[in-house]
Amino acid sequence: MLYELLAADSGLFNLLNYITFRTGAAVVTAFLVTVLFGDMLINFLRARQGKGQPIRDLSLEMQLSKQGTPTMGGFLIWLGLIVGVALWGNLQNPYVWVTLFVTFSYAILGFLDDYAKVTKQSTDGVSAGARLIAGFGIAALACAIIMGLHGAHTPAGHAEWGPFNPLAEWIAGFAPQTSVEPADPNFSGGVAVPFVNNYFLPLGGFFILFGMIVIVGAANAVNFTDGLDGLAIVPMTFAAAAYAMIAYLTGNFVFASYLGIQFAPGAGELAVLLGALIGSGMGFLWYNAYPAKVFMGDTGSLGLGGMLGVVAVATKHEFALVVIGGLFVIEAVSVLTQIGWFKITKRLTGEGKRIFLMAPLHHHFQKKNWPETRVVVRFWILSVLFALAGLATLKLR
């Protein structure tokens, strides 16, 4: 809002033309909004939810003491994000809108799940199948839009779209304009190969399927991680900070050329959006730190993961997400391997066996009698190391 109104003015308001300034301002604004309105929203949720989020008895220390804590705290994160982006973001940027579309669509899915759990006082919400179908549908639309936006800067045009080329051309009309052409003609429908300068593996229309897997996978990985007080939000802010840097570098032709990464016109504006997320995430931690006054619920975790996934796709740094979001990947893999190994061994021997004492992985360490705070802080340490390692890969080319 302020960008559109004042950026053209000279003098002090010229600062609004700098993404770095607006990103910092979005961090501070979102943090203040989240902290100032936190108690009010938590009291509202507590009054509306009564018994709060149902807690499944996993025979873990202090677990049932969390009974009665309100959920849907993701609304607090989204409040700070909206205000931060509305004030400091460029609302004419299509990458901002497609990211917000995925974020809030996934947040709505999460809200429906949380609402079902609270109203039925059951740990079972919306079926996993329904959530996956809706999640893949949302991701498919977002990836098609991103592919169309990238196609505006691709010499080969929109050949991958076939009979839907007019739609691709219409989407491309919203893309930020630039006279710089991508170094690789497969930029639109390709996947960047790690550690190789400006080379994209051509996938054509299958790029949409690949992007869907990235977005849905990220959303569910963050959802798996959100199991202890403060566990998910801090790694999320570290990952957001790393991708804010990537978005800024990707959207700047000079820096992108120096690092040998693909220049994506307009993608730098995602740094402002991620800055608002960092601020609201820190503000949410104010209330979610042990012992938590509120849980983010699926309202928060699905939207956060969806945002991380769509930013990775938009900046063409999908594989970097495996490193930057390494903690989320480990948590998700622990769940998948636990389920898979149990089913395989049950089929082969008649008795299912487990790799971990309990999955996701943070519960495994709780079962080993680690205090909750020790698990959380050590996972935070790992997450910042993963984020730094992911940024380091930008120069390994």
From Swiss-Prot:
The record's catalysed reaction(s) read: UDP-N-acetyl-alpha-D-muramoyl-L-alanyl-gamma-D-glutamyl-meso-2,6-diaminopimeloyl-D-alanyl-D-alanine + di-trans,octa-cis-undecaprenyl phosphate = di-trans,octa-cis-undecaprenyl diphospho-N-acetyl-alpha-D-muramoyl-L-alanyl-D-glutamyl-meso-2,6-diaminopimeloyl-D-alanyl-D-alanine + UMP
Q: Which GO terms describe its cellular component?
A: plasma membrane
* Alphabetized InterPro entries for the sequence: Glycosyl_transferase_4, PNAcMuramoyl-5peptid_Trfase, PNAcMuramoyl-5peptid_Trfase_CS
Q: What GO molecular function annotations does the UniProt record carry, in alphabetical order? A: metal ion binding; phospho-N-acetylmuramoyl-pentapeptide-transferase activity; UDP-N-acetylmuramoyl-L-alanyl-D-glutamyl-meso-2,6-diaminopimelyl-D-alanyl-D-alanine:undecaprenyl-phosphate transferase activity
Question: Would the keyword Cell inner membrane turn up in this protein's UniProt record?
Answer: yes
Keyword Metal-binding, does the record have it? yes
Q: How does it sit in the membrane?
A: Multi-pass membrane protein
Q: Which GO terms describe its biological process?
A: cell division; cell wall organization; peptidoglycan biosynthetic process; regulation of cell shape
In Swiss-Prot or TrEMBL terms, this protein is called Phospho-N-acetylmuramoyl-pentapeptide-transferase
Family annotation (Pfam families):
Glycos_transf_4
Q: Which pathway does the UniProt entry assign to this protein?
A: Cell wall biogenesis; peptidoglycan biosynthesis
What family is reported? Belongs to the glycosyltransferase 4 family. MraY subfamily.
Query: Which metal ions or organic cofactors does this protein require, according to UniProt?
Result: Mg(2+)
- The portions of this protein that span the membrane are 25-45, 71-91, 96-116, 132-152, 199-219, 230-250, 266-286, 294-314, 319-339, 375-395
Q: What does this protein do?
A: Catalyzes the initial step of the lipid cycle reactions in the biosynthesis of the cell wall peptidoglycan: transfers peptidoglycan precursor phospho-MurNAc-pentapeptide from UDP-MurNAc-pentapeptide onto the lipid carrier undecaprenyl phosphate, yielding undecaprenyl-pyrophosphoryl-MurNAc-pentapeptide, known as lipid I.
- Alphabetic keyword roster: Cell cycle, Cell division, Cell inner membrane, Cell membrane, Cell shape, Cell wall biogenesis/degradation, Magnesium, Membrane, Metal-binding, Peptidoglycan synthesis, Transferase, Transmembrane, Transmembrane helix
Q: Where in the cell is it found?
A: Cell inner membrane
Q: Which HAMAP family match?
A: MraY (MF_00038)
| Record-listed E.C. numbers | 2.7.8.13
